[in-house]
Amino acid sequence: LRYAAGIVKPLPIPSPRTVLFRLHWALGLTAGFVLALMGLTGALMSYEEAITAFANRDRMRVEAADRVPLAPTALAARIDAQAGGRIVNALTLSDDPNASAFVRFARDPETRVRPPSVYADPYDGAVLGPVRLEAAFATVRDLHRWLLIPGGSKGWGRTITGACTLALIVFLATGLYLRWPKIHRWRIWLKPSLSRPGRPRWWSLHAVAGTWLTPVYLVIALTGLTWSYPAFKDGATWLLAGPSERAKPARMAGHGEASPVPDSRPDAVDRAWAAFRAGEGQEAGVVTLTLPGADTATIRIRWLPRGVASLSARNEARYDAATGAFLSAEHAADTPLGRQILQSILEVHRGRFFGDLFALLFCLAALAMPGFAATGLTLYILRRRATVPCRRRAPGGASPRGG
């Protein structure tokens, strides 16, 4: 209530547009800066593989000459002998004879922490050195996912980033509503007016860039929520693949506990590898062989066709850990689109699922998030500066505007 000359007047009820506008800038002053940090770290991780490959270019190459590569079990045994108690969990091999092997170790059974990965010579098993920048990108990933707050995925950091991801969807919805023109002119809607001075220029840049990037941010937000909220992931799984997919166990090694491996034999791995190389492996480019152990109860071979780099085209075959007999295979070409999206949710999140051009677009969109925080803060400050003189001139100190 406002009191003026003894008369009580009710405060005007703000319009929906005013409420949404205040919600937009209030979230911008809070969640906006967390999203800016998530955008920067996400953009950096968009090209993690390329950056890591450049930093390790000397360790990723070996001299093949006329040497014959070791069988997987022999290669793993030689690496284990140099690893100081660490056990090889997976080998990534290439059809390029001059490419080194990428070696991932099994998690520590007590701490569940995975030791640093290394590169190794596939011909003699010599360890060429650890993967440079792996630890740095692990820190960037933790910063992106839960802000390095103690507790990791079970702490408050995941709650905060999940809430900020929801805020991004609110930004998109309220921004489009507030910007929806009374006069529909595509030139005004899609082209920024940078020649206008002051607040109009910043508003035009903020609004037009947001309009262009709305589809990208929507994909980023919706896929990001699958890591933040299990219920949302279950709903997305049901929508994309049907209810039967929800009952399947986790496919990724290290996610949950697998059943113990009964009577696993080293020669079974070599049999499975030989069968794969004689069959579908003839057209394989990059192959990841996951050995049976505490994390995986079968021999799993995942591969990309020769000349293909997108993980969304990855195929998979499974073999019995005791005999090396073929169990099942799954090919990307035969997988329905919904399941492809679920199995490559990270690639969708990064834009690589749609091709290299979209990967670059998603990276640039992530880099633009700090720009939205900066322009939004600039608009807020300029608006507050313009509002204070108006309040001083208004009778009784009342603001002439509801915003």
Where are these regions (language model features)?
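Conserved histidines in hydrophobic membrane contexts and catalytic metal-binding motifs
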Residues: 2-403
